[in-house]
Amino acid sequence: MRYFFSLIACLVLFSQCKDEKIKMNYTYVDQNNNRYYISQFTIDYRPIKASESSSGVYDGGEEKTVTVSEVNYTEIVALAEQILENKYHENLKREMLTAVLYSKDQDDNKRSVILKPSEKRTLFEKLLKEALKK
């Protein structure tokens, strides 16, 4: 009986951890300063306009908001968490060709990482762009 209650306690803790991740919001700013706001099952893309770009020419396209499946959302969040936790690809300051990933939870706890080009960053951008195509 004691093991049963221990098992139930573990399940409750794990389910709360899952809920914590769902309540996280992420913002990804790519190397061109296009912004991707990622919240529960939604990606909101806010591109930079030519008038805002350093070149005065680059335009990130049209704004778009999409709903993503739970599977896609979970995949995006899992990779975002890996990137935030493993700061191997972190740069100390924002320079050309870097991107920034931010996270904020429901208690307003914030984390961020400045990213140099890497395979994980490329994969993360690919997941976001694929989600926006749907």
Indicate where each model-derived feature is located.
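Mature extracytoplasmic domains of secretory-pathway proteins
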Residues: 54-90
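Bacterial N-terminal signal peptides
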Residues: 6-12
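Positively charged n-region of N-terminal signal peptides that target proteins for export
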Residues: 1-4
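Post-signal peptide N-terminal segment of mature Sec-exported envelope proteins
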Residues: 25-44
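C-terminal motif of bacterial Sec signal peptides marking the signal peptidase cleavage site
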Residues: 14-16
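Short amphipathic beta-strand/extended segments with alternating polar/hydrophobic composition
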Residues: 37-41, 59-61, 65-68, 108-118
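A short, structured beta-strand/loop element
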Residues: 41-52, 95-98
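Short, well-ordered, aromatic-rich surface patches in folded extracellular/luminal domains
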Residues: 18-28, 93-134
